[in-house]
Swiss-Prot record:
GO cellular component, as recorded: large ribosomal subunit
The keyword Oxidoreductase is assigned to this record: no
Source organism: Lactiplantibacillus plantarum (strain ATCC BAA-793 / NCIMB 8826 / WCFS1) (Lactobacillus plantarum)
GO annotation, biological process: translation
Gene field: rpmD
Pfam families, alphabetized: Ribosomal_L30
Lineage: Bacteria, Bacillati, Bacillota, Bacilli, Lactobacillales
Top-level lineage group: Bacteria
Gene Ontology terms for molecular function: structural constituent of ribosome
Protein name according to UniProt: Large ribosomal subunit protein uL30
Amino acid sequence: MAQLKITLVRSAAHRLPKQRKIVKELGLGRINSSVVKPDDAATRGQIFHIAHLVDVEIIK
C-alpha cells in the first residue's frame, strides 16, 4: 500500500479552528515538519481541508 509524506509548508496560525485541529491530528507541529501516513480515504479527506498549507508526496 502506498504511503503519503505530508509536509507543512505554511503556518496554521490564524486559520479556522477546524484546520488547526487537522494539522495537529496529523502530527504536524512546525513549518517544514513532515509525517508519513497511509494513503487511505481518511487521510485524503484531511489533506483536502488543508491542501493550501501542505505539500504531499506519494511514497511507494
